[in-house]
A protein has these predicted regions:
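TPR-adjacent "capping" and linker segments in tetratricopeptide-repeat scaffold/adaptor proteins
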Residues: 1-13
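Alpha-helical segment of the N-proximal tetratricopeptide repeat
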Residues: 12-40, 53, 57
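Terminal low-complexity/charged segments
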Residues: 13-16, 141, 175
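Structural signature of tandem alpha-helical TPR/SEL1-like repeats
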Residues: 23-32, 57-70, 91-104, 114, ...
Length: 219
């Protein structure tokens, strides 16, 4: 959660207090404190974005959307609020709106890796596979060490039957993050699919060692 650069109205102590409550998972207490601050500072977009994030964590997605919309109405170039709108719309199954808002966030911060990553996830959700691949590749162009993007690309290529490309992406994810249990599991399943059964058990064992409760480890 980013904090406002212009702190002329809110004190740093006030900002730190609500951010700490949010970071500690004390969402309702954070909401109560933010509402009290809103009475004195009614047009601070940071507060609306943060209360929206709290609502989202509490499962109150419609309330979250309202707060994020208020934040961008006050501050039309508020990157994080647009990104939060996109993610929340996706969570609600409103994929066209999710894409629209995530693209708006990227227009503000073109090289923000998290926005591109969430856009890629959204495209995959609506089976826009080529656009998902393009967005994931943008993620790794911006941050070549983003292991989850390589793993997700591996999943896309595996699902489309391009198993050897999938293996290359899973192996890259593991190279970046040797403790990436899900990538080991995915790699094992792909080796099994292409009949390299001698390699698959090694990957499954690594996955189990790293994350014993990993679901569907033998996929």
């Amino acid at each position: 959660m980013t904090t406002p650069s212009n702190q002329s109205r809110l004190t740093q102590e006030q900002i730190n207090s609500v951010v700490t409550l949010y970071s500690n998972g004390d969402y309702q207490e954070a909401i109560d404190q933010i509402k009290a601050l809103n009475a004195s500072y009614p047009n601070v977009p940071f507060l609306f974005n943060l209360i929206g994030a709290c609502y989202k964590e509490l499962g109150r997605s419609k309330g979250a959307l309202k707060m994020f919309e208020t934040a961008v109405k006050i501050k039309p170039d508020y990157f994080e609020a647009y990104k939060n709108l996109g993610i929340t719309h996706r969570d609600l199954g409103q994929f066209e709106l999710a894409v629209e808002k995530l693209k708006s966030s990227i227009a503000i911060e073109p090289n923000n890796v998290d926005a591109h990553y969430n856009l890629a996830i959204t495209y995959k959700d609506i089976n826009e596979i080529d656009k998902a691949i393009e967005s994931y590749k943008k993620v790794i162009e911006i941050n070549p060490k983003f292991a989850a993007a390589y793993n997700n690309l591996g999943n896309i290529f595996k699902e489309s039957g391009r198993k050897h490309s999938a293996i290359a992406y899973y192996e890259k994810a593991i190279e970046i993050n040797p403790k990436f249990a899900e990538a080991f599991n995915n790699l094992g399943n792909t080796f099994r699919d292409i009949k390299k059964r001698e390699k698959a058990p090694i990957c499954f064992e690594q996955a189990i060692d790293l994350k014993p409760d990993l679901e569907f480890v033998l996929g």
